[in-house]
Amino acid sequence: MDFDLNGGNKRVFNRLGGGGGSTRPMAPTDTRQKVCFHWRAGRCNRSPCPYLHRELPGPGPGQGQGPGYTNKRVAEESGFAGPSHRRGPGFNGNSSSSWGRFGGNRTVTKTEKVCNFWVDGNCTYGDKCRYLHCWSKGESFALLTQLDGHEKLVSGIALPSGSDKLYTGSKDETLRVWDCASGQCTGVLKLGGEIGCVLSEGPWLLVGMPNLVKAWNIETNADQSLSGPVGQVYSLVVGTDLLFAGTQDGSILAWRYNAATNCFEPSASLTGHTLAVVTLYVGANRLYSGSMDKTIKVWSLDNLQCIQTLTDHSSVVMSLICWDQFLLSCSLDNTVKIWAAIEGGNLEVTYTHKEEHGVLALCGVHDAEAKPVLLCACNDNTLRLYDLPSLGLFIRFTERGKIFAKQEIRAIQIGPGGIFFTGDGTGQVKVWKWCTEPTAALP
């Protein structure tokens, strides 16, 4: 408990001098009837001191307080005694220990916020700092390394299957290539426009940019520019043999891959959203799209027709994923919603998980023990990890850890061998790994 430097002793004095239930008159206010706070802490250097350098005598039985009121209770309420239900764990209640918050061996309760001075390398409090000196909270995962190079927000991360190269895209208009063995940047490609998203599909690396999609075949070095989008391309996904792009003008463009010519050819344009399409996901022979217009649209991959529009979110729909037979969506309205099909095939909300902040991105993974975990990035610069023991009748989000960042985490990517990646608004990419044994967080 924090001790009130200005009013704490006064409250103790008032209780000792007469409070609720007292039949004797209140003693006159006099500094000589107050115990010196600095003397109690063992460091008073005033001579003479206007306050007492001894403890006040306690009231006799039945005097000064109501029934059942004891000196022990007075001491506990003033913040100077042993254990009480209001004290944090690890409080040393030994009478010989230092009192108040100055000294003693009391355990420091950590605030769930990274110390800014530690980030800058000049925190002098060490283990006694009330803020965290690490980038995560949790024992089942650990930070492996950090990849520095981007100067602005990381908007996409891709790890092609079977490749030893990691690709990251950023609003600094560059695509960086990283060697997975050494963690070193082996190439930087300046694209001349902000990168909105990055996708790996087979041998193809696809990058969303203003007014186009860039496509590279990393096996043959062939490249292609797919024109047609109006404004920034925010999201890319592949369904059956079609590539879909969500664009700033609210349309979804589709290209079909022609194996004979090794090229993507325009196929269709899906319209219906009134604002930018910021997220796409394919599952159960459906294309799901989330938009700044606060809606989710469900499209049939058979005929590319919209078969349902979901309107339960009250702000921008930021991310969509499918998990088993469920659709999960998140929004800047501070919620994660779980949708399930009802009779007739339409989706409805079966559970809403509320956060204190807007939710930016979702990613479903399995930990080292193959347990399902939901990664949930929020706009308070954190990534929350939730156990998902069931998405059936009894849905529950159980938090198992947090990852902290200097700015918002906007990109998440899963890798092989229990590895996953996060990219934040400063341009930092961090590499994490699930642990088979509990491991303390690394700085």
Curated annotation (Swiss-Prot):
GO terms for molecular function: DNA binding; mRNA binding; zinc ion binding. The gene is ZFWD2. Transmembrane segments: none annotated. InterPro entries: G-protein_beta_WD-40_rep, WD40/YVTN_repeat-like_dom_sf, WD40_repeat_dom_sf, WD40_rpt, WDR86-like, Znf_CCCH, Znf_CCCH_sf. A zinc finger (C3H1-type) spans 30-56, 109-136. Residues 1-29, 56-99 are annotated as: Disordered. Gene3D superfamilies: YVTN repeat-like/Quinoprotein amine dehydrogenase (2.130.10.10). This is Zinc finger CCCH domain-containing protein 63.
